[in-house]
């Protein structure tokens, strides 16, 4: 079902954002598009938008119950979500609990190494620049956020990490790493925005020891492992308690 909505405000790789009936709200439609490597790899996967929308809704609801402010307001349909309008901070906050992926390519840290405390990195959100990693000095040079906002972002991200780690662990899932996008609402409150889904989280299945079969996230698409929709569907089943 497509809800009544205003004009298209923005279209990204995985979602479309439309005006809603109030200026401080927007409607988000989750698409079936799958992309990787800054959209150099593309495909359309039937059902992906529905799965990511519903997984994100359940995870936002869990965070809200735990007192974490998010932009989420309501699940309007299987693929549409009503959220607060936010001014997105142009940073990707990446938290790593286990070393894998680019961290192992860029450092001598062995894949599978548990990271305690979790590693928190900030990346400048710009596809044209390849979303570069920002040092503290470069962050100050760009003037994207104040020192106080930097502290608030780290505190919020680490709180989200602890909640998601515990929640996924209760579902026999390991949260390897994930990215967060944050924004400020009309009152200036820092909120978790965008989505939290297998597109943005690496999730490994504790119930499966096979190094490929245990992958239940976007790496199945990145690495041509197949079974992307089945993996996302398994995440939704567990998140919903089915």
Curated annotation (Swiss-Prot):
The keyword Repeat does not apply. InterPro entries: SAICAR_synt/ADE2_N, SAICAR_synt_PurC, SAICAR_synth, SAICAR_synthetase, SAICAR_synthetase_CS. Its EC number is 6.3.2.6. CDD domains: SAICAR_synt_PurC. One of its GO terms (molecular function) is phosphoribosylaminoimidazolesuccinocarboxamide synthase activity. Keywords: ATP-binding, Ligase, Nucleotide-binding, Purine biosynthesis. GO terms for biological process: 'de novo' IMP biosynthetic process; cobalamin biosynthetic process. PROSITE patterns: SAICAR_SYNTHETASE_1. Pathway: Purine metabolism; IMP biosynthesis via de novo pathway; 5-amino-1-(5-phospho-D-ribosyl)imidazole-4-carboxamide from 5-amino-1-(5-phospho-D-ribosyl)imidazole-4-carboxylate: step 1/2. It catalyses: 5-amino-1-(5-phospho-D-ribosyl)imidazole-4-carboxylate + L-aspartate + ATP = (2S)-2-[5-amino-1-(5-phospho-beta-D-ribosyl)imidazole-4-carboxamido]succinate + ADP + phosphate + 2 H(+). PANTHER family: MULTIFUNCTIONAL PROTEIN ADE2 (PTHR43599), SI:DKEY-6E2.2 (PTHR43599:SF3). This is Phosphoribosylaminoimidazole-succinocarboxamide synthase. The lineage of its organism: Bacteria, Bacillati, Cyanobacteriota, Cyanophyceae, Synechococcales.
């Amino acid at each position: 079902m497509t809800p009544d909505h205003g004009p298209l405000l923005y279209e990204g790789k995985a979602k479309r954002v439309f005006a809603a009936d109030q200026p401080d709200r927007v409607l988000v439609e989750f698409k079936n598009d799958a992309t990787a490597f800054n959209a150099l790899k593309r495909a359309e996967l039937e059902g992906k938008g529905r799965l990511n929308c519903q997984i994100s809704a359940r995870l936002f609801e869990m965070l809200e119950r735990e007192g974490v402010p998010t932009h989420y307001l309501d699940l309007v349909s299987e693929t549409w979500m009503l959220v607060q309008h936010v001014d997105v901070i142009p940073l990707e906050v990446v938290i790593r609990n286990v070393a894998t992926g680019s961290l192992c390519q860029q450092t001598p840290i062995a894949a599978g190494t548990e990271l305690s405390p979790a590693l928190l990195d900030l990346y400048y959100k710009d596809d044209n620049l390849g979303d570069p990693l920002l040092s503290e000095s470069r962050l100050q040079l760009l003037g994207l956020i104040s020192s106080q906002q930097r502290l608030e972002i780290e505190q919020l991200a680490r709180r989200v990490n602890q909640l998601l780690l515990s929640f996924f662990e209760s579902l026999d899932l390991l949260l390897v790493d994930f990215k967060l996008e944050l924004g400020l609402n009309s009152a200036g409150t820092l909120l978790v925005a965008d989505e939290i889904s297998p597109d943005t989280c690496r999730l490994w299945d504790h119930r499966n020891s096979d190094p490929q079969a245990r992958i239940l996230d976007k790496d199945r698409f990145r690495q041509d492992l197949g079974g992307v929709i089945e993996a996302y569907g398994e995440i939704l089943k567990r998140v919903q308690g089915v």
